[in-house]
Amino acid sequence: MTVRSFSGPAGCGKTFQLMAALSGVLRERPLQNGEKVLALTFMHGSRRRLDERLAALPISQSHYECSTLDSFAWRLVRRWQTLLLSIGHQVAAAADYELICAQAAELLAHRVVTLWAACAFPIVVVDEAQDLTPSRLAIIQQLANHVELLVASDEFQCLSEDLRPNRACEWLTGMGGEMVLAQPWRTNDRELLAAARAVRDGEPPQSGRQFKVVSTPNAGMAATWISNGISWNRQGNRVAIITPTMGDFARSVHTWIETRTTTRGNGPHRVLLEESEVTRCDRFLEGLALPDELEARDAHALMEGHPRTIGKAFTEWVDRQRRCQGRTEFTRNEVEMTLRQLFSNQRRMNSGDGAGVRALTVHGAKNREFDVVFVLWPAAIGGDAVQKRRLLYNAITRARRSCVVLAQSTRALQAPPFV
């Protein structure tokens, strides 16, 4: 079996090359009955984009599965839990993703498990491999000797300081068969390309017409830039407000845009605020009067006044537990874990990007593209100089047509990633 990998800067067509390579493999080795292509990535946003790419190939939807690595690992652990118990491990809780992946990797060390996986999925595609933690990388390494493995990665797009040096990228380079891509395809705007290249190379990005770095000491000034930009933007374009952290500065800007009008008469504008399921669930639990023991008959009352989709999913779960297992009481910890899983499921099923304006973090914007990008750069950002360059690079490279960086602190403009 072979390992082929594609690496290079953002927007250079790594995922495109993955799909082209997959098409070539399928021509040389058509799938047999019961076989599927397995496409894996770390985050749900990347999974949705990968799923869209797979749907465009001349391959039946029944012949591929697109999943996060965590979901695949959970499926593996559940299927082989008897073996897991026999080697002295209890099945990890559904929300303990790191342990689930570690257990899945340990199971794949057993030949019977690896051969089962290889028979079901003789071709495995992995996107955004630079984000793989050691346990997730171990899953891919166990599969590598038994499947056709196609991988895309870019070490500089890894936003976790804990993954430096990047073991996944080092392993892929050491395996050989790596194609390094350099030609950008996401945008042909010279200013955007030059700014991204400068940040990546540790040099100061230069402002121009389509790329600008602006000092905006207060939320009102930053919001005015964005609100005017939204109004002057062509209808139908996808606009993103991207920030390293959704802190006070970003939230104040978001509120201003949605409630105020600029001196030029622009605004207010509706902005879809994207948050991680962890943040949303934490806020949901804070507002929930959750008892230590929940009676099944009280589940509906507990969900009153809360988002209908989550409330409905939770009460249906309680009803299933009551009907199938005769349960009438649930602990606080069990309820919290179930709600966290429901929020995660909801994020997984969200649709792709459409026209409009959305606010999100750099992490949430990974592997996505927008016509117009505004980057909110707050005064305080954690991490070393390299980390800050990676954050800014990942934000700038989401833009296809224009990007404006709005820095809260003038002092920040005299330090990396701006110098």
Where are these regions (language model features)?
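The feature marks helicase ATPase cores and/or their adjacent C-terminal helical subdomains
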Residues: 1-419
